[in-house]
Amino acid sequence: MIEQYGIDISTAQGKIDWDKLARNEHLAFVIIRAAQGTAQDSAFDRNIKEALRTDIPFGLYFASGATTEEGVEAEARFAAEFCEAFHPQFGAWFDMELKKHAALGKRKISTLLRRWLEIVGETGTSAGVYTNRNWLKNLIEPAVFEKQDGARYPLWYAAYPNIEGRTLTDAWKDNRQKLSYPQAAIWQWTSKGRIEGISTNVDMNVCYEDFAALTGEDETPEEYVTVEEAARMLSNLGVRGVIL
């Protein structure tokens, strides 16, 4: 089984020293928050530029604020632009976890999740869902993850066991949480991790999926669009793009 260690970040982590991250021999990937709803994360410009510069493989995640199908479709189209611009090797992830979302009920939530996955998946990016044990058990229909071709949309599963250590490789100390959902592609095992280069606590993850195989690409694609080209693509949506 593949085990790759990574973190996920947003504006909450402040200014990150990406050179220190790049020197960490255990860090295999970073999942960057790209947006909340259809508003770009305020730290995204710097984070994506630095991920590209330091050649750290990355995924993107999108925090939802929508409660209607029309709203989720707009968020998905917004996310698709990021995916087409930046080709995230570790997937694009939909994070729907607010109280107003839970109030929608299982059937509606499942419909919204599935719609986002379908739209973003059309870009060729591996589109998945970030969620926790309670939502999986009570608020998401299992069929959400099933594709028509028999494959599955990947799951990024958050569950925090009682682990004393908080470094990247400490997840091995208690794998029972991961094993409770063996289909999880990524397990987020703590929100209190510490890593050189980031001054705050940070979420830490273990990836068990070969995303290069899912997308048909090498882990690090041979070609990206340039940062300038990506900025132009994002400007079509009225966002700032990448600050050079």
What would you call each of these model-derived segments?
Residues 1-126:
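Substrate-binding cleft of extracellular glycoside hydrolase catalytic domains
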Residues 82-85, 120, 178, 214-215, ...:
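Alpha-helix C-terminal capping segments
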Residues 90-174:
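Catalytic domains of cell-wall/extracellular-matrix polysaccharide-remodeling enzymes
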Residues 220-244:
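Short, low-complexity, charged amphipathic interaction modules
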Residues 17, 68-71, 105, 109, ...:
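General structural signal for secondary-structure boundaries
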Residues 39, 67, 136, 164, ...:
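Flexible, glycine-rich phosphate/dinucleotide-binding loops
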Residues 1-11, 16, 24, 143-225:
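Functionally critical loop-and-helix segments that line ligand-binding/catalytic clefts
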